[in-house]
Amino acid sequence: MRRGSAEMRAEMNRIFWAADSTVQTNDYTTYPQTGIGQVFPLFVKPEYQVCNHAKNGRSTKSFMDEGRLKAIEERIGAGDFLFIQFGHNDEKKEDPTRYTEPFSTYMENLETFIRVAKDHSAYPVLITPLERRCFMDEKHLGIGAHSDYVAAMKQTAEKNNVPLVDLYSMSRMELKKAGEKNSRRWYMFFPEGEYKNHPEKSEDNTHLRYDGAVNFASLIARGLKEIGGIYAEMLLDLSLIHISEP
């Protein structure tokens, strides 16, 4: 049943999140992998509920084709938010079930997500994809992994008058500041034997551990604060938040 009345909205504000594995909620079977949407509740007021629909490996195309956007459409209501964060899998040319062309089908798909939110009097927010850990040496990042998709998302935001959080640019700055070695702690990059349920070595430069998820979630929170208005109202006082791994 779709919730839309003012009375029900006063009880709980909902943030729906359509995205991929960088945002997905994980469990003990995939620990220490942690998604941004999994930890984002740490940054929002208790009257806001994060409804995380992010799923590993999905692009805008496969997310819709599998009925995942439809599932959001059946629940989202007036005053809710829809965070839209894709790019990692849209760029996979070798997979026709996921690939989208940045300045045509990708933009068209983003506009479909936006329409779903607006048709239900909800608030869409576009979030550029998280940068991969793509160092050339200790201090220098390589060419951005998602540059065309970032540019396409920015064009879509401007065309449709939708707020945008540029996580891509902010995460690149964070990676440059941290450097190659120090940034490993944010990603699934660790030696053999560090985790009991993941005993093998991992050099995954895309997926996150807890510290990384929290760090990049905080960047999204910062972006929402800069947008202001209802987007900032959902946030706790960021200056008072101190989070350590559970």
Predicted regions and their residues:
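Solvent-exposed, flexible loop/coil residues
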Residues: 27, 40, 67, 212, ...
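Short, solvent-exposed polar/charged micro-motifs at secondary-structure junctions
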Residues: 60-64, 175-178, 244
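Acidic/histidine-rich helix-loop elements
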Residues: 26-32, 54-63, 93-101
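Gly/Ser/Thr-rich beta-alpha loop segments that engage phosphate groups in nucleotides
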Residues: 21, 59, 89
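Residue-level preference for alpha-helix termini and adjacent loops
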Residues: 22, 62, 205-207
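Alpha-helical cap/lid subdomain in secreted, periplasmic
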Residues: 67-214, 218-236
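Serine-esterase "nucleophile elbow" of acetyl-processing enzymes
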Residues: 1-55, 70-81
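Residue-level detector of conserved catalytic or cofactor/ligand-binding positions
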Residues: 239-246
